[in-house]
Amino acid sequence: MNNKLVKLIALLGLSINVASAEAPEVNGNLGTKFSSDYHRRGQLVSQEAIQAQVGFNVGLGGVDVFGDFFTNQSTSSDGADNDELTVGLGNSFFEDKLSAYVGIYNTDNSESGDNLEAFASLGLDFPLSPTVSVYRDTDDSLYTFEGQVSYGVDLEIVNLELAGILGNTDVSSAVDSTYFGATLTATKTIKDNVDLYADVSLSDNDTRDNETLWGVGLSVKF
């Protein structure tokens, strides 16, 4: 983790302490998953990977403070390991119809190294739950723009969710890539706050043919 990221997280923690002396409402989640492949922004990171994730959300004086750590550990000889850390602040407006988020997103890849981005997102409490996000590399003027939608249905036996993503990312100052993804997830609650799920995804970008990915995982909320 680079020094810039450490300083930003420390500053965020200081602002949280100053902003509110109230007892915070804390929620968390963790999970693990086996995935046939891991794609990030339309690019293959690794095949056959074990993934783990832990996250938190703290409500302080009307502001949500959130963080998430995700790791992808390749089990194949030609794959890369990837660690991703997200920390940010969010708030809701217009009777929770509009949500806004800002934060930092750090990726550490075993082959390409460490990269830190700032991001801003807007989400709408409308059908399909549309969200738009923009990311900017803190060292170079490289941008990523993403739009996401999702739709869920409760079938009693399982919950189904279909999610789609469309984005464009600057690979370098001279090259960009447009990518698309769609994921269908089936989730079964096996105990209070414990879910078992399976998903299948389609991943595509403008430099290759589309690929199909799948995974199975377990998630816990607390």
Regions found by a protein language model. Give the residues of each.
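Outer-membrane beta-barrel proteins
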Residues: 2-5, 13, 17-222
